[in-house]
């Protein structure tokens, strides 16, 4: 079934696909519900969470605490664990019946599989891996004026436009592209985890949230795969998004790569519970694994403390860390762009400065 421009006016509400794992919501759900609340307010529509699973009604109210007006729970034993065929079938069936205007999906492994499949079935567009969303044109223009190097002073914008404006990195993060889907609905977007700020939980809003449970039907013909068992692999992956302290390294460690990484690890340990990140140049050079990358093509982070060691500060990197509460930069080049967004900047050789930082932190803790 395809929806086109003739049907657009019949579509209502902002939807967020909420991902559960083993009966528990994930942090990305709360980020998207929080962002969806802003978009729904801009559009003057309701915010609806769509939750697929089995016996997950009890966790649905939590989504209301972050802004959902309503949560639709689709319940079936085969939805307990994610499978492409079951989830795509159920989600598309509900969408075709309810006709949401916008669907936001987290750009997780599951979301990146589910989103494109549903968009293809619904014959609509999907913008993947978004880092910014707007409906109100005034807010979009404000975003451009503060986050773009473009001179927009002579540009004109259709201020009456109410399409969802979806911004995402393009060409390896060298450009930011804003995409709209004006002729088809629903408008679909996958959103990068960690880029949207989670709102404060409200118990009052949670109690006011309406939860509607739908017991769906799935036939054997609908199910091409079946989850028999899940075996979890023990793998150490750095959690950049959830970290409160991040010490990142850049190309400035090139004269002694292993020594530079070791210094970053020692500094992170000195702070306490810090983790090590890296710029794209570091990851592309193979000095750190890909899950350590900070920036538009890596993770977007906002820790309490972000330390940039030997990072020049390309716009792609700054876009992924500039919302950190406190930014400390160390670079031997006093003109490095990283200093433009740093709260504290130190010009000099990081191999000499970082040991002094470590000693100062230890002395402060022992005082």
Curated annotation (Swiss-Prot):
GO term, biological process aspect, one: fatty acid beta-oxidation using acyl-CoA dehydrogenase
Domain of life: Bacteria
Similarity-based family: Belongs to the ETF alpha-subunit/FixB family.
Subcellular location: Cytoplasm
GO molecular function, one term: flavin adenine dinucleotide binding
CDD domains: ETF_alpha (cd01715)
UniProt cross-references to Pfam families, sorted A to Z: ETF, ETF_alpha
Oligomeric and partner information: Heterohexadecamer; tetramer of tetramers. Each tetramer is composed of 2 alpha (AcrC), a beta (AcrA) and a gamma (AcrB) subunit.
Name this protein carries in UniProt: Acryloyl-CoA reductase electron transfer subunit beta
InterPro entries noted in UniProt: DHS-like_NAD/FAD-binding_dom, ETF_a/b_N, ETF_a/FixB, ETF_alpha_N, ETF_asu_C, ETF_beta, Rossmann-like_a/b/a_fold
GO cellular component, one term: cytoplasm
Functional note: Part of the ETF-acryloyl-CoA reductase complex involved in the pathway of L-alanine fermentation. The electron transfer flavoprotein (ETF) serves as a specific electron acceptor for acryloyl-CoA reductase.
Annotated residues for binding of FAD: 305-333
Principal location: cytoplasm
Keyword annotations of the record: Cytoplasm, Electron transport, Transport
SUPFAM superfamilies xrefs: Adenine nucleotide alpha hydrolases-like, DHS-like NAD/FAD-binding domain
